[in-house]
Design a protein with these regions (language model features):
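Acidic, PIN/NYN-like endoribonuclease modules and their adjacent C-terminal/linker elements
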Residues: 1, 15, 43-44, 104-152
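Short, well-structured N-terminal submotif of metal-dependent ribonuclease cores
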Residues: 1-38, 44-59, 65, 83-89, ...
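Residue-level detector of alpha-helical recognition elements and their boundaries
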Residues: 22, 61, 93, 116, ...
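Short, charged/polar low-complexity linear motifs in solvent-exposed/disordered segments
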Residues: 29-30, 72-73, 94-95, 128, ...
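General small-molecule cofactor/ligand-binding pocket signal
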Residues: 37, 68, 139-141
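Active-site neighborhoods of divalent-metal-dependent phosphate/nucleic-acid chemistry enzymes
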Residues: 66-125, 147
Length: 152
């Protein structure tokens, strides 16, 4: 399994509201249960975050992280999300995350962004646009939904 992880998940590790599910998600990534896909868009956003959040990226063994750079094709798809009203220009970076994850065919984009990403109606919009332009559909989930259950 490979999961594109947006910036909200990295920050969720240290957030009381989200850490209950984010910490186990990253622990399982460290164990190699899945590969985390990290884009240059995410890295750029993390550089503006508190240092402790950026340092979390180095806690994942490199063999379980795939680094990707945004392509012209992905930028064009992100632009289409905005042009067709799925997102406003203010949230173009969210459109970029979704476009990258769509085109590289990850198993899921993982996010805590309920307004723009983990949102049933918006996912329908993204997938409609993806299909219109012959791109794969995208699955978007929270860390809670993709973390393996542990027996207690």
């Amino acid at each position: 399994m490979n999961f594109y992880v947006d910036t909200s998940v990295w920050g969720g590790y240290f957030d009381k509201e989200f850490s209950e599910w984010t910490v186990p998600f990253f622990e399982q990534a460290k164990q190699g249960r899945f590969t985390l896909v990290l884009s240059d868009v995410t890295i750029g956003e993390l550089q503006n975050a508190p240092k402790i959040i950026m340092e979390l990226t180095t806690a994942i063994p490199p063999q379980y992280i795939e680094l990707v750079s945004i392509t012209d094709e992905q930028l064009e798809l992100a632009d289409q999300y905005v042009k067709e009203g799925a997102l406003t220009p203010k949230f173009h970076s969210d459109a970029q995350h979704i476009a990258i994850a769509s085109i590289i065919k990850v198993d899921s984009l993982v996010s805590w962004n309920f307004k723009h990403m983990v949102n049933f109606f918006r996912i329908k919009q993204y997938n409609s646009i993806n299909l219109k332009y012959f791109h794969p559909i995208i699955d978007i989930r929270t860390p809670k939904e993709v973390t393996y259950e542990t027996e207690e």
